[in-house]
Amino acid sequence: MQFDTLPQLGDSVSKICLGTMTWGQQNSEQDAHEQMDYALAQGVNFWDTAEMYPSPPDKDKQGDTERFMGSWFAKTGKRNDVVLASKISRNDFLRGGNTKFDKKTIRAALDSNLQRLQTDHIDIYQLHWPERQTNFFG
């Protein structure tokens, strides 16, 4: 496995990132755990998730991907072996429909991420979709 260093973190991260957006929709919790075991065994230590996963977004399944990851961290104790990235989302079924990225909303989202992930920190936190006047990319 090839690695790069994240300057602000000083962490060595794999050039391949484990994406998780289907866990809870196309993959079961057991499947997710097996994929995390395999990824780490192959040296993939950079993992990405988001509060809105699984995809496509569904208010009844929202957060399942992070919950699966959190149960794996609790079971294995390997949270510190992973560089974890997650994201705040703007889905209108989250936080009572508040889709603004203000301090209060970001804090509420982050607290929920941490609870589902069963961890006290997320290494990289991102805005899943920027606030913009149009729904088009670009």
Tell me the role of every PLM-derived stretch.
Residues Y53-P57, N91-G96, Q133-T134:
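A short acidic, helix-capping loop that chelates divalent metal ions and anchors anionic groups
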Residues F46-A50, V83-S86, H121-L127:
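Short beta-strand segments at enzyme active-site cores
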Residues A39, K87, R116:
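Conserved catalytic core of Hanks-type protein kinase domains
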Residues G19-Q30, D92-R107:
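Active-site mouth loops of central-metabolism enzymes
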Residues R95-G138:
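Glycine/proline-rich, positively charged
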Residues M21-W23, M52, K87-N91, L127-P130:
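Active-site beta-loop-alpha junctions enriched in small/polar residues
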Residues F68-W72, V83, K87, T105-S112:
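Generic beta-strand or strand-like secondary-structure segments
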Residues M1-V82:
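N-terminal binding-site loop/beta-alpha segment at the start of enzyme catalytic domains
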